[in-house]
Amino acid sequence: ALTYREMAERDSTHLNFILQYISECYSQMKDTENYVNTLREGFTRYPSFPFFYPRLIEYYQNCNMNDSAMAVTDKALKTDSTNINFMLTKSTLLLNRGDYAESLYYCYNILQKDSTVADTYYNIGLIYFNQAIEIDKVRQTSAAKKRQMENLYRQSLPYLEKYRAMAPEKKQRW
């Protein structure tokens, strides 16, 4: 299939699918460098095509290249700031690096657009839960900090319960 790559790429009408097939060939051949380069090219040319973005993000996260994942997500949001998948990924990346307020901002924007996105509830629950854990890690906490911690745990609970009800098959998360 790769033998005819140059000829196939001249078909601009179907180039998004051609780049998808080329990247899949590289993946099957375990040629990571060309696989990722083709994903990047595909995403650059077709940011809203559903194949390239999630695979690029998955690759970057598997390689612990979170800054690259964030950069791709920021580019994606510039092309479509209302795309729930892009917003959820941004929220998750922010959550993972501890930017809770900004992550929460994206979560609430998602819920305004679509309240059926289960992972949004999961992220909100984790935002509150993780903040409580951070307080709990401190050996000597004041009574006020303990109350704050308990309040954060309480705040997380309805979101995590909602996630559990919406995604009962994802037991490893709850």
What are these regions (language model features)?
Residues 7-8, 41-42, 75-76, 109-110, ...:
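Canonical positions in the second alpha-helix
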Residues 18-19, 52-53, 87, 121, ...:
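Canonical tetratricopeptide repeat
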Residues 21-22, 55-56, 90, 124, ...:
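Structural register within alpha-helical repeat arrays
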Residues 29-30, 62-64, 96-98, 125, ...:
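Short coil/turn linking the two alpha-helices of tandem helical-hairpin repeats
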